[in-house]
């Protein structure tokens, strides 16, 4: 997971501070299957983004204070040794059975709170904020209301309304995926208007309360969420 800070026009960009932070998952994006240069094979990747509601800064004068964010990317796998499975198990402080892992619905993690440990790593003239570890929220401790609008995207169940809200560079990456190219190939021979699901989430207000109510309606109380 990378968040460049000192490169070209990004020289003054702020990144999440080091340390242990209260966090909430607000975005999960399936990036599809592309060629992995490191491993020299094709891998399907998924990205998780977390807001840090107690760490605020002004990134845009018109918007005022907003929370920092951090992100991490995994291979889309819930195998016993898979990094994503270990990450989710650490998130909730509980081991999964193979059946639980196979049945686990990843998008249920949207809105889930946690504690994350952020470290800074440098490479050449850049500094990155990385998630070193994740753990459950301590008992009795609450995560502040959500600020960012929750978002999830699945390359095998394309939602144009969500896709157009993604950054352009991410859209371009997804368009290179096997899933996107396969869908384009199929639609070239048989096209019909997709039935996009309705997004029932409200846009967050200044304190995020309306959005939190929506999340609680879907997943229950913000406290002690455990999807497995």
Regions found by a protein language model. Give the residues of each.
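Short beta-rich binding modules
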Residues: 1-228
């Amino acid at each position: 997971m990378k968040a460049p800070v000192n490169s070209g026009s990004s020289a003054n960009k702020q990144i999440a501070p080091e340390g242990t932070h209260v966090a909430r998952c607000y975005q999960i994006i399936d990036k599809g299957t592309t060629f992995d240069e490191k491993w020299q094979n094709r891998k399907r990747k998924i990205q998780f983004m977390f807001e840090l509601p107690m760490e605020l800064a002004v990134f845009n004068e018109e918007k005022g204070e907003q929370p920092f964010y951090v992100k991490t990317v995994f291979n889309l796998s819930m195998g016993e040794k898979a990094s994503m499975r270990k990450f989710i198990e650490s998130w909730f402080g509980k081991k999964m059975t193979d059946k639980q892992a196979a049945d686990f619905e990843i998008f249920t993690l949207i809105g889930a709170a946690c504690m994350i440990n952020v470290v800074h790593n440098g490479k050449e003239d850049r500094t990155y904020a990385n998630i070193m570890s994740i753990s459950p929220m301590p008992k009795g401790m609450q995560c502040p209301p959500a600020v960012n609008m929750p978002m999830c995207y699945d390359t095998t169940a394309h939602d144009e309304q969500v896709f157009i809200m993604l950054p352009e560079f991410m859209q371009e990456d997804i368009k290179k995926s096997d899933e996107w190219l396969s869908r384009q190939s199929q639609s070239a021979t048989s096209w019909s208007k997709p039935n996009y699901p309705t997004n029932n989430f409200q846009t967050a207000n200044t304190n995020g309360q309306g959005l939190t109510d929506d999340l609680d309606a879907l997943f229950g109380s913000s406290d002690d969420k455990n999807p497995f």
